[in-house]
C-alpha cells in the first residue's frame, strides 16, 4: 500500500500577497524579505522607521505586517498598530516581533499575534498562512504546533 503523498506547496493555505516589514535591524529586515519572497510572497516592503511605515500604510494597505515593536526611532511600534486598528475589520494581520513579549500590553497583543525573538522564518511563514483570527490573542513562543 503506497504511503500518503507528502504535503505539497499547492496544498498549503496561501500566503499574503503583500507584506510590510517594519524592522530597524537591516540584516534582519533583508533576511525576512528574502525568506518571504522565497516562500512566495509577491510584494515585500521593508521600512526601518515608524515614519516610513506610517507613510507606506497611507500609500497602500498590506495584507500583513511584521512589526518589530522596539524600533530605534521611537521606543515602540504602537503608533503603527493604532493606525492599523483604525482600518477596521479588513485591517492587515499584524505579527508583533519582540525579544520581550511580556512587555506588550494585552490590548495591543489582541490586535495581532506576538512572536518572540529569536524565531525561525518557517514559524513566521506558517503563522502568515493561518487564517486571520479576530478578537483572539495568539501568543507564539517558539514553534507553531
Can you describe what each PLM-predicted range is?
Residues 49, 75-79:
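Acidic catalytic/metal-coordinating carboxylates
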Residues 78-90:
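Short amphipathic alpha-helix used as the core "switch/output" element in two-component signaling
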Residues 1-20, 27, 85, 113, ...:
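Non-catalytic signal-transmission and effector/linker regions of two-component phosphorelay proteins
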Residues 97-98:
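Hydrophobic/aromatic residues positioned on beta-strands within the core alpha/beta folds
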Amino acid at each position: 500500500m503506497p504511503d500518503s503523498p507528502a504535503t505539497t506547496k499547492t496544498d498549503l493555505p496561501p500566503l499574503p500577497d503583500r507584506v510590510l516589514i517594519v524592522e530597524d535591524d537591516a540584516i534582519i529586515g533583508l533576511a525576512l524579505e528574502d525568506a518571504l519572497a522565497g516562500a512566495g510572497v509577491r510584494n515585500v516592503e521593508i521600512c526601518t522607521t515608524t515614519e516610513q511605515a506610517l507613510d507606506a500604510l497611507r500609500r497602500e494597505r498590506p495584507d500583513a505586517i511584521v512589526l518589530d515593536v522596539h524600533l530605534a526611532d521611537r521606543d515602540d511600534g504602537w503608533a503603527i498598530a493604532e493606525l492599523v486598528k483604525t482600518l477596521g475589520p479588513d485591517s492587515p494581520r499584524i505579527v508583533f516581533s519582540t525579544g520581550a513579549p511580556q512587555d506588550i500590553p494585552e490590548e495591543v497583543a489582541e490586535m495581532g499575534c506576538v512572536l518572540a525573538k529569536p524565531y525561525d522564518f518557517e514559524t513566521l511563514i506558517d503563522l502568515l498562512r493561518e487564517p486571520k483570527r479576530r478578537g483572539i490573542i495568539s501568543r507564539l513562543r517558539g514553534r507553531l504546533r
